[in-house]
């Protein structure tokens, strides 16, 4: 694509992502209401659809006052660091064969790097707030990301071995006309999904902002637009993890009859619904259970899956 087309597509994608994150907040609340046998938002607009617009306007008009003694540089930087890397991660996501801003040779690694940056936002926000609850949340976030990032990378390496490339388009092309990698890599898909929940800080892996014991965790001292940026980063992270899962395991844009971008969007929406369903269905484990599961169960399984996949790939090549 020319520079002008790339700029135009980037602007359209930015607006679409911001709108999708807002609509997702409404959809999550409606779905949680249905799963918990209550109404959910139903006052602002038809079926409460404009509730996310009202919430956005409310947060834009609220005062954003840092606490006394806060490290202002870290306090202000953290919300931006939570949201902007997620937007950058979508720059390498291939929505169709030629519908991508930059199809990097290391696209998968780039997205993983952007997801890993979220922990810096959480730690900076906790440190800058000078609040005990926030610091506990930041420490939990750092330990959790260290544990789950380890097998997040290993779980997707099976797809990279089968496709022979880190490029998003090549991974989707390897699944076209054949089996999706979720059928060839069921264990890898399950482990990647669990690690994705942790990377997006979603229940049951949201112990860094556990309301029962940490008030709001690293976000305790935030309000107004800074608070909104943290939430925007969280919902964009869900969409980014869902987009990466779709690319790696669900054939990306591949599908019959409908155009590729529509298939891609439907698959991402389905994965996002599963995220919400798990939030309604699962309890929150103890912190030590969560970390023990990552190091003692998930990491060995990810290594085993990688070894078996490598053996199969070498056998094919031979």
Swiss-Prot record:
Domain of life: Bacteria
GO molecular function, one term: quinone binding
One Pfam short name: NADHdh
Location, primary (coarse class): membrane
GO cellular component, one term: plasma membrane
Enzyme class: translocase
Matches recorded under InterPro entries: NADH_UbQ_OxRdtase_su1/FPO (IPR001694)
Keywords: Cell inner membrane, Cell membrane, Membrane, NAD, Quinone, Translocase, Transmembrane, Transmembrane helix, Ubiquinone
Catalysis performed (reactions): a quinone + NADH + 5 H(+)(in) = a quinol + NAD(+) + 4 H(+)(out)
EC number of this enzyme: 7.1.1.-
Record function comment: NDH-1 shuttles electrons from NADH, via FMN and iron-sulfur (Fe-S) centers, to quinones in the respiratory chain. The immediate electron acceptor for the enzyme in this species is believed to be ubiquinone. Couples the redox reaction to proton translocation (for every two electrons transferred, four hydrogen ions are translocated across the cytoplasmic membrane), and thus conserves the redox energy in a proton gradient. This subunit may bind ubiquinone.
Identification of the protein by name: NADH-quinone oxidoreductase subunit H 2
Organism: Cereibacter sphaeroides (strain ATCC 17023 / DSM 158 / JCM 6121 / CCUG 31486 / LMG 2827 / NBRC 12203 / NCIMB 8253 / ATH 2.4.1.)
